[in-house]
């Protein structure tokens, strides 16, 4: 049902540089890296750019989930040879293993798990959940229909053009197009839209009955590559209402939007 990554060894992800204090503070938390890749086919491994990079921190006692987006253009040490590049190059070059190692090394974390999805998986999940309600600004509306057309073409999932700015009920493809928008502002604003779509979708999932949750799992899980097994997921899926999304933020907070190199 779920594409479990057999090449990903969790014990390799132990961060040797983490302080004892930090390790103590992280007890009782489950930290998972979420990668959204912009594949134009169904592939999710290396060779794809990670468009979405979110660190998901779950407090296993309280059920609070914190989401922190890493801006994909953040310059970090992306490999163990001190090579600095835009962070999404880590996933492109070395897949989830290199990306998780880079997050741990640069951000002083100990992430042992990850899940990677492509846009079709997100669109399918939101369609099963019945869509989400979003207020579109005029600038967002100006660009969204081009993204809808492109996302329909790359996923093969049907949708239609939106008619106006303001309150809109978005289907899966339209919600993905909204999360992908960036031409009229920055990656900072884009990651806020991504987290908004995750929050709205998660709220729908929490309210859904078990047959809907089961349908999401059956349709979406085969499209996800992950170090997490079904045994990890099923207890949480049966007890979804105890989880809630708390703080969400973008990293780094220092918002110097400097263009690097010719491509920017």
Predicted segments with their positions:
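Non-catalytic, solvent-exposed segments at the cell envelope interface
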Residues: 1-264
């Amino acid at each position: 049902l779920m594409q479990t990554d057999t090449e990903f060894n969790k014990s390799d992800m132990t961060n040797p540089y983490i302080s004892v204090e930090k390790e103590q503070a992280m007890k009782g938390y489950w930290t998972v890296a979420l990668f959204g890749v912009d594949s134009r086919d169904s592939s999710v491994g290396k060779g794809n750019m990670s468009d979405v990079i979110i660190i998901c921190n779950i407090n296993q006692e309280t059920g609070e989930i914190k989401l922190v987006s890493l801006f994909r253009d953040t310059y970090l040490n992306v490999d163990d040879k001190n090579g600095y590049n835009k962070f999404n190059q880590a996933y492109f070059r070395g897949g989830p293993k290199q990306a998780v190692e880079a997050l741990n090394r640069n951000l002083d974390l100990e992430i042992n798990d990850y899940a990677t999805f492509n846009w079709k998986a997100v669109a399918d999940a939101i369609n099963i959940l019945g869509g989400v309600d979003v207020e579109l600004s005029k600038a967002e509306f100006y660009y969204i229909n081009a993204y809808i057309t492109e996302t329909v073409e790359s996923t093969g999932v049907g949708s239609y053009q939106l008619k106006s700015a303001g309150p809109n009920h978005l289907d899966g493809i339209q919600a993905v197009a909204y999360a992908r928008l960036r031409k009229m502002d920055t990656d900072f604003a884009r990651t806020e839209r991504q987290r908004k779509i995750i929050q709205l979708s998660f709220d729908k999932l929490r309210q859904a009955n078990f047959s809907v949750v089961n349908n999401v799992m059956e349709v979406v899980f085969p499209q996800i590559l992950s170090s997490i097994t079904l045994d990890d997921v099923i207890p949480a899926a049966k007890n979804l209402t105890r989880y809630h999304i708390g703080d969400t933020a973008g990293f780094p907070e220092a918002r110097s939007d400097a263009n690097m190199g010719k491509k920017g």
